[in-house]
Amino acid sequence: MPATDLNTMPDHQPNTQQILAAGPKPRIAFATMVGDEPFFLPIWISYYARFVPKDQLFILVDGAHRILPPEADGCQILTLPHVIPGPGWDHARWAMISAFTTMLLGRFDVVVFNDVDEIIVADPDCGTGLIDLIARARDVGVISPFAIEVLHRTDLEPAALHNRAPILSQRRYGRINASYCKPCITARPVRYSLGGHYSDYPDLHLDPHLYLFHLRFADYTMLLARQSNRQGLMAAGGKGGDAVAGAGWSKGAAEMNDFLQSFVKAGPPIDTDFSFGWQRAKITKSWVHDPDGGIWRHDKLHNRKTYTIPPRFADIF
């Protein structure tokens, strides 16, 4: 099936009513699933609430014991029974998420599902807003944004991340990680792979103007704390390792430290126009059906090169 590039931001705090009033409104739902996320969930809510009313933000909550931030008031909250992780746990979770997004498509034109530390942004230079770019999924079925993994380059930005200023004004560096060019903008029912990295949808539409910023590695201390929590979840389910969730869930503090330091050792950040033409072409050309998983996927593309995130993105979220 074809793999193609789609061809044809607001400032940090735009007027939500102006965004919602600009032309015909496609019905778009944004959804995520969380445990305890006191830092990233308020960012996720505050960002997407600038584009759609809060009742179009859906939050699946893993367990009634979770504490939600005040920003969640007005969002669609679905509290689920907590399930102790065991073999097959994350596969079952993503099967549930696939079914949930399909259900939402019964009432919405497009559903955008991401982990809470993944933010989709329209390139401010493209001249088209986030909602209009996302709405193109109605024509093509499924859209994947280009993925940038935001890095904490402790040698260049030693200060801890905080919520008193936009994230990308504090973290100006990232790397390419094609695994996060996820088929996360859907106007058709899909069955997601583990982690939502791929799906059974046969066409790849890698949008030239949409970026997914993955924030997992944006702060060293926060990374270690979240990773420790994930390891605790894995341990609660007993033995199982990668059979419980993705391999990244079981990595320890030393591995996380070595990962971030590997970018420091690899050299200074590279300044580019942020179009990443050959990388996009490689992702597109590698599109293939995986019969074992019953999914369509592209090659992984990542290395230890650090890229400077252009200043035009600094105040978006």
Report residues per predicted region:
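Short, acidic, metal-binding catalytic loop of nucleotide-sugar glycosyltransferases
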Residues: 46-55
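Conserved acidic residues
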Residues: 55, 109, 117, 141, ...
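Catalytic-site signature of metal-activated, phosphate-bearing donor transferases
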Residues: 90-95, 122-317
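Short internal beta-strands
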Residues: 58-61
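A structural signal for short coil/turn segments at secondary-structure junctions
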Residues: 52, 104-108, 137-138
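Short acidic catalytic loops
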Residues: 48, 112-119
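Active-site-proximal specificity loops/subdomain of glycosyltransferases
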Residues: 65-113, 122
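N-proximal low-complexity "stem/linker" segments adjacent to membrane-targeting elements
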Residues: 1-42
